Each structure stands twice: as structure tokens, then as C-alpha cells.
Amino acid sequence: MSSTRLETLALCLQNVLADKLANVDQQLDQLIITVSPVNLLPVMSVLRDHPELGFEMLIDLCGVDYSIYGVEPTSEQGREGKRFAVVYHLLSIRHNRRVRVKAFPEDDEFPVVVSVIDIWPSANWFEREAFDLYGIVFTGHPDLRRILTDYGFIGNPFRKDFPLSGNVEMRYDPDQQRVVYQPVTIEPRQITPRVIREEHYGDSE
């Protein structure tokens, strides 16, 4: 969206949602609003139902693990040191615009947010995926179980503290004539330190 349209949408959101917004930001031609988990459900309902907003479609939902992210959190980002986020991408077909919504669960050890499945049924499998990969619990979800990993899988593979080699590996056992699980035999690998460059690195070259 153009900067003018983004500013118009930002002003509309601030007028309609007022103190329910923790933060409003623009990044890469995208409007991002941060919402407290306590206000998530009422905010999402307004985003869908208000005639000036009309975000009738949830096109994506994902989890984020910000631990060892490499960038210090600031109050302006609305994160303030919290580890996990749930990110929602909404589309208004009527007004031809998008908005990104972030909610940061309060408890890093047991991240919980309310399910938005009653507002957008498409959230069903999205929330199951975030639960499976990040361990984020969505209260009110009618069938919150793993969707990508095995039923007996241990841990959440998209968390930053999950080992790259996993916890177990599979092999065929000729004596038992079946596939069996065993502890991983891969040796730890040397990981190259992450390099975070400045935002406009290389622009002058």
C-alpha cells in the first residue's frame, strides 16, 4: 500500500480501537499493530466487523520465537523482552488492504493466547501448526493437537532451543523387521555465528 493509504488506515485503527492497541508501526509497506493477549479477541472482532475496516479474511497465522534474535527489544516494538509472538495476517477484500497483528503471550514457559477460530474458521489448522511447532496453546480451540509431527514427537521443532539434529532418529532394525526409534547418533556441529547487518548495509556500493 502507498504511504498515504497506510497513514489513513493507521489513523482509522487508532480512532476505532484507541487504547486497545499497544503499538502501531509501519515496516516494508505493511501496517503492524501490537495487541495485548487480553484484548486480542475484542480487537479481532472489531477488525472483522467494523465497516471502515472489514478484514473478513485471515490469510495466515504463525508463531515466532524471538529468543537469541540478535536485536534488543524496545518498548516501541511492543515486545519488551517477551519470547513468543503470534502473528496474524488479515485481508480486507472490500477495501483492498492488509494488516498484520501481533500478540505476545505473557508467559514464556507456557505461552497461551485465545483462539480466533470463532471469528475466522480458517484459523483452525493455522493454530494447530503454531501449537505443534512452537508449543503455543490456543484456548478455546476445539481440536488442538499436532498437525505436522508424529503423535509421540518430543518438543517443538521451531523453538530456538530445539536441537538441530532432533532428539531421536529412525532406522530399520533387521532383527525386529520394523522401523525403530533411537537416540540421535549425529555428532554436534559447529554453527557459524549469526551476522546481523545494518538495515541499509551495502546501499552505497
Swiss-Prot record:
PROSITE patterns: COMPLEX1_30K
Protein's UniProt keywords contain Transport: yes
Primary location group: membrane
Record's keyword terms, sorted: Cell inner membrane, Cell membrane, Membrane, NAD, Quinone, Translocase, Transport, Ubiquinone
Molecular function GO labels: NADH dehydrogenase (ubiquinone) activity; NADH:ubiquinone reductase (non-electrogenic) activity; quinone binding
Localisation: Cell inner membrane
Subunit description: NDH-1 is composed of 14 different subunits. Subunits NuoB, C, D, E, F, and G constitute the peripheral sector of the complex.
GO cellular component: plasma membrane
Keyword Mitochondrion: no
Bilayer topology: Peripheral membrane protein
InterPro entries, alphabetized: NADH_DH_suC, NADH_quin_OxRdtase_su_C/D-like, NADH_UbQ_OxRdtase_30kDa_su, NADH_UbQ_OxRdtase_CS
UniProt cross-references to PANTHER family, sorted A to Z: NADH DEHYDROGENASE [UBIQUINONE] IRON-SULFUR PROTEIN 3, MITOCHONDRIAL, NADH DEHYDROGENASE UBIQUINONE IRON-SULFUR PROTEIN 3
Protein EC: 7.1.1.-
Protein name as annotated: NADH-quinone oxidoreductase subunit C
Role: NDH-1 shuttles electrons from NADH, via FMN and iron-sulfur (Fe-S) centers, to quinones in the respiratory chain. The immediate electron acceptor for the enzyme in this species is believed to be ubiquinone. Couples the redox reaction to proton translocation (for every two electrons transferred, four hydrogen ions are translocated across the cytoplasmic membrane), and thus conserves the redox energy in a proton gradient.
Known catalytic reactions: a quinone + NADH + 5 H(+)(in) = a quinol + NAD(+) + 4 H(+)(out)
Recorded family membership: Belongs to the complex I 30 kDa subunit family.
Enzyme category, top tier: translocase
